């Protein structure tokens, strides 16, 4: 192990040497519709740029990266004309909107990590709100370590009385977070589990159904005078739940229609005179009105709880903007969230809810009443939205799962994986966002839904359980008869239960028999084998990518830890082909099953 320790020491020294800040002056970049100024004091270089008066105005600098990876980025700016939001691009792809707090002098805005290729890259700032000044872009001249997204997640739901089905769903999401990204789709307004044009497009293009389905209680308030004919939204959701035997995930938002003393009911601020501040003040008629509406929607959700159906619940969504009546006062909105929670959980006994906050991240955010964080992004491209993800992840210190609760374009899945942008799930809005080729072609949908990282409905367990012991993130559909083999021996114990052996060791669930995984859309038993590196204090590698070698053997890195590589022989090696790491069968002949890995045929060990 001496050589391995030397390598680790050298890596640490290299990173410490390279991890310095490199400044790229904005005035030296490519300017579109903006000019160089020198009036303000405190700038570096030959000046600064602004003012970003018109849409599309931009500054772009070219930066050098010594290696491919994630790099911390900051922007030196001045926003003396008020808080501004403008868009960041990397290599001509949108990575998210950046909020620049109002100030009176040049200050540094930490943007977070961005993904850079080895060599030349472009970083740009494009006018959205505009009207600000940029002095320089600053990156660390060494890539960051891989992000640990799951180890700090809150272990349980905020509601200690959550029903077993909700606990199981949360554990399932938690177990897969940082490993898989679930697919999702928003249905038509007022519908639940409908398999209309959105689902039909997905299924036709991909052969898959989304893991997460979304409904909207948009018509379920007392002021709303129009709602669909029977069956109502609750009946539709229950029918969907029964049809798929609990093997689906339902999410819901509430476009809360309400009327003030004058005017019609609405959820947009501009269309209702309803007052949020009064609504969270006990004794007002506005307070009494919201309580009656909460009671109404709780009656619907209570029916879902009666059939053991958990629900990812997203009320007061997009409260970081002022376009909805509940979003124009962060402090009052946070108070309304707590009123919702207390009324629904403690008064109505709704324990099937997983609470998703989709809005402000500030001192008012009701962190102790939140399970999951949602972000809504309607981007102009399929970028992974790295900056938006990192901003929300970092605000909660990695304790809350971050999901795309609404998206226009699905982010490129492979880019998400490469850049450690682990959205728990994506959830595409309905209508043209999923139906039109200008947003998604059939080829893109097929690529994204069939990506090995994406989990669709066919891989979900049933969440319809009356009890749950909390020791797994999923369940398998095999029988539960006892087996003396517990997965700790080299013999494949699952064959006796009618399931194949896993090639990898990705644990999806555990029961009295042993550990279970999913490969080729089928449950398989995981056999935990020992290897030469374990006596040295290091686990066995699942893959076989060699990073280093010493007198002990070959070493790889997995899960940010060194591991020992075990070189197995298989029948294919005698024919001049390597052994497969996975077990996806492409072809079969007289020798056995064949797969393709690293653009080469390989033999599958059965």
UniProtKB/Swiss-Prot annotation:
Query: Which molecular function GO terms apply here?
Result: carbohydrate binding; mannan endo-1,4-beta-mannosidase activity
CBM10 domain ranges (all copies): 491-527, 530-566, 569-605
Q: Which PROSITE patterns match?
A: CBM10, CBM6, GH26
List, alphabetically, the InterPro entries matched: CBM10/Dockerin_dom (IPR002883), CBM6 (IPR005084), Dockerin_dom_fun_sf (IPR009034), Galactose-bd-like_sf (IPR008979), GH26_dom (IPR022790), Glyco_hydro_26 (IPR000805), Glycoside_hydrolase_SF (IPR017853)
Q: What is the protein's name according to its record?
A: Mannan endo-1,4-beta-mannosidase A
Protein encoded by which gene: MANA
Please state every residue range assigned to the domain named CBM6.
22-140
Q: Which reaction does it catalyse?
A: Random hydrolysis of (1->4)-beta-D-mannosidic linkages in mannans, galactomannans and glucomannans
Its signal peptide is 1-19
Q: Name one GO biological process term.
A: substituted mannan metabolic process
| Record's comment describing the protein's domains | Consists of a catalytic N-terminal domain linked to a reiterated non-catalytic C-terminal domain.
GH26 domain boundaries? 164-458
Binding locations of substrate? 285, 323, 378, 493
Q: Where is this region: Linker?
A: 472-489
């Amino acid at each position: 192990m001496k050589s391995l320790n030397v390598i680790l020491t050298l890596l640490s020294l290299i990173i410490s040497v390279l991890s310095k800040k490199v400044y790229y002056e904005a005035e030296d970049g490519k300017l579109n519709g903006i000019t160089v100024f020198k009036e303000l004091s405190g700038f570096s270089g030959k000046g600064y740029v602004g003012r970003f008066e018109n849409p599309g105005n931009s500054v772009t600098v070219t930066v050098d990266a010594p290696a491919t990876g994630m790099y911390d980025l900051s922007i030196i700016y001045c926003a003396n004309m008020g808080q501004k939001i403008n868009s960041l691009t990397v290599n001509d792809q949108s990575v998210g909107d950046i909020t620049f707090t109002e100030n009176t002098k040049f200050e540094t805005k930490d943007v977070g990590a961005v993904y850079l290729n080895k060599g030349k890259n472009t970083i740009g700032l494009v006018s959205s709100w505009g009207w600000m000044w940029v002095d320089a872009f600053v990156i660390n001249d060494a890539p960051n370590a891989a992000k640990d997204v799951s180890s700090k997640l809150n272990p349980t739901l905020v509601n200690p009385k959550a029903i077993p089905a909700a606990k199981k769903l949360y554990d399932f999401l938690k177990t897969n977070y940082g490993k898989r990204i679930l697919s999702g789709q928003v249905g038509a307004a007022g519908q639940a589990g409908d398999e209309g044009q959105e689902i039909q497009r997905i299924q036709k293009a991909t052969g898959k159904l989304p893991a997460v389905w979304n409904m909207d209680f948009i018509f379920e308030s007392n002021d709303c005078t129009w709602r669909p004919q029977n069956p109502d939204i609750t009946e539709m959701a229950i029918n969907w739940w029964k049809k798929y035997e609990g093997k689906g995930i339902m999410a819901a938002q509430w476009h809360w229609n309400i009327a003030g003393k004058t005017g019609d009911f609405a959820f947009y601020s501009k269309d209702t005179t309803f007052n949020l501040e009064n609504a969270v003040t006990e004794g007002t008629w506005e307070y009494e009105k919201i309580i009656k509406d909460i009671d109404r929607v709780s009656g619907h959700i209570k029916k879902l709880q009666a059939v053991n159906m958990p629900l990812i619940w997203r009320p007061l969504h997009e409260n970081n903007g002022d376009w909805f009546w509940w979003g124009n006062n962060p402090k009052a909105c946070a108070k309304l969230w707590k009123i919702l929670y207390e009324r629904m959980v403690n008064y109505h006994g709704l324990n099937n809810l997983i609470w998703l906050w989709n809005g402000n991240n500030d001192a008012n955010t009701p962190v102790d009443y939140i399970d999951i964080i949602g972000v809504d992004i309607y981007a102009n491209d399929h970028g992974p939205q790295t900056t938006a993800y990192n901003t929300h992840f970092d605000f909660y210190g990695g304790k809350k799962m971050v999901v795309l609760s609404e998206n226009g374009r699905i982010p490129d899945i492979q880019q998400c994986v490469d850049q450690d942008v682990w959205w728990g799930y994506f959830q595409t809005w309905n209508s043209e966002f999923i139906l039109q080729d200008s947003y998604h072609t059939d080829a893109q949908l097929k690529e994204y839904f069939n990506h090995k990282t994406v989990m669709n409905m066919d891989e979900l367990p049933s969440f319809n359980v009356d009890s749950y012991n909390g020791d797994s993130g999923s369940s398998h559909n095999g029988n539960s008869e006892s087996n003396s083999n517990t997965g700790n021996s080299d013999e494949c114990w699952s064959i006796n239960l009618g399931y194949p052996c896993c090639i990898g060791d990705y644990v999806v669930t555990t029961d009295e028999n042993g550990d279970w995984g999913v490969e080729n859309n089928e449950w398989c038993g995981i056999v935990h084998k020992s290897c030469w590196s374990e006596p040295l204090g290091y686990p066995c590698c699942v893959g076989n990518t060699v990073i280093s070698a010493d007198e002990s053997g070959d070493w790889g890195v997995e899960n940010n830890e060194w591991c020992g590589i075990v070189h197995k022989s298989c029948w294919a090696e005698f024919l001049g082909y390597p052994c497969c790491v996975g077990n996806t069968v492409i072809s079969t002949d007289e020798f056995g099953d064949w797969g393709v890995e690293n653009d080469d045929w390989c033999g599958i060990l059965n």
